[in-house]
Amino acid sequence: MSALANRFVTKMNGLGNAIVVLDLRGTGIVISAAEARAIGQGKGLHFDQLMVLHDPLSPGSAAFMRIYNIDGSLAGACGNGTRCVAWTLLREDHRIGAELMLETAAGQLACLKLAEDRFSVDMGKPAFAWDAIPLAHPVPDTNAVDLARDLAVLPPVDPDALRKASMVNMGNPHAVLFVADQDACDLALVGPVLEHHPLFPDRANISIATVVSPDHIVLKVWERGAGATLACGSAACATLVAAVRHGLAAREARISLPGGDLTIAWRAADDHVIMTGPVTFEFTTRLDPSLFQALVA
């Protein structure tokens, strides 16, 4: 029988971004891509991201998180999922202002409880160097990258936006395209092409953004390994940063995604990006042993 059989998982969402939290602290278990995919087949457990908690690597941290997409691939960051993990670990601590530190492969994330269902997360500093994003080769300016190059057929999106895409790493690689008309861009057609663009050796998250005003941006996101999602916290962070770099937005703005709004602030004092938004608890259940039968046969 799989070591994951009958273990409890918590299903949550952050602005509709489907999250499953699995606490494996104290077990030494590291799940495989196939096991992550199997969990997503459980009743009601289809996820955009699976947040797996392990023993912390650093003193003062509550947990080390491995983050899986629904296809079993690993993600470097998930802002909505991090808020859900913070809610899970601070569930019995009703103090407003309660804090905890979480770790990922991309670094430490400080979480702050603002209300029972609202948290902020310090997502760290954005990276802009071509090899930090990463890109397949150097480019003159990561804030204006021509993604039309190397594509035999251009996806249905504003050509000017495609030729001036902004690259940001917020734990994950992000490409942000600013368009005047969201409805003119079919994300289901644009997202897969750009996610697998030859410039992105690790694939990329694709953000299609419209700046309504300096403090309001409308955004839809194609996540690598997950597809179109109702919300993506790291993409919201990357989009605000890209908008500031383009001179289109203030350093704090409301980012409106299909699932709702996030508040993103890029602090001038230390360059850290702070994401604030809600979480919603759905249910807790046990993992059905039958999910893993094909994997241990």
Curated annotation (Swiss-Prot):
Q: Which SUPFAM superfamilies match?
A: Diaminopimelate epimerase-like
Q: Which GO terms describe its biological process?
A: lysine biosynthetic process via diaminopimelate
Spell out the residues of the site Could be important to modulate the pK values of the two catalytic cysteine residues: 174, 223
The record ties this protein, via Pfam families, to: DAP_epimerase (PF01678)
What's a single GO MF annotation on this record?
diaminopimelate epimerase activity
Give the EC number(s) listed in the UniProt record: 5.1.1.7
Amino-acid biosynthesis listed as a keyword: yes
Enzyme class, spelled out: isomerase
Localization, per the record, is:
Cytoplasm
Entry keyword annotation includes S-adenosyl-L-methionine: no
Q: What is the name of this protein?
A: Diaminopimelate epimerase
Which species is the source of this protein?
Beijerinckia indica subsp. indica (strain ATCC 9039 / DSM 1715 / NCIMB 8712)
Organism lineage reads as:
Bacteria, Pseudomonadati, Pseudomonadota, Alphaproteobacteria, Hyphomicrobiales
